[in-house]
Amino acid sequence: MRVCVFTDNSYIFEGFCRLLSRFEGHTFDFFYSPWNAAFTPSVRFRPLRLKEQSTEFFDSYDLFLSLHSKQLFPAELVENHLCVNVHPGLNPHNRGWFPQVFSILNGLPCGVTIHKMDTELDHGPILWQEELELRAEDTSKDIYDRILAKELEMLEAHLPDLLAGNYTLTPMAGEGNINYKADFDRLCQIDRNECATYGQVIDRLRALTHAPYENAYFLDEDGKRVYVGITLRKET
């Protein structure tokens, strides 16, 4: 089987590559988004813009994998080829941007979903999924790191069956909810006059604390951003 893998996540790329020794007889080609400055082109890992590819390119692969790709897969691709997404959320809850951020805020379950893609965002029948515990001391970075580790664990466990076609497609349990980048951007600006409980403030800050990124901020008297984060430690 010839597999086309799209990822913009270095941790997932490196971890997935370590699994490949188990899959002799299959060919894996790796691509990332051209605007991703974190990567350098190499023989094994090349920039490629999906929407500019021809039908001949799509037809040359048996399976397309999206592993934290920043590109939307074209309708022509997902409607005519097997495309599978590894999504860092528990579909149908918090589809879209940064599922773990919104799980901290709205209390919906978080986890990992491997699903067949369709033309909607983070949508389609489910192959495998696992829920992860969201702890009171978790920041976005804490739970996200566990999600990434779980993704690699699930890929190792289920990739043989995926390549062999040994899986069952289960419809999503409803449409759930979806969050967009604009929703996240609105969360980042803190209004110091907004009324909230201590619990709501703590949850907002831990949802937006994700080193090395500076997300939460308020504006000072000069209109300059002052960035805010939170450190949490559970007693032993």
Language-model features: locations:
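One-carbon transfer enzymes
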Residues: 1-236
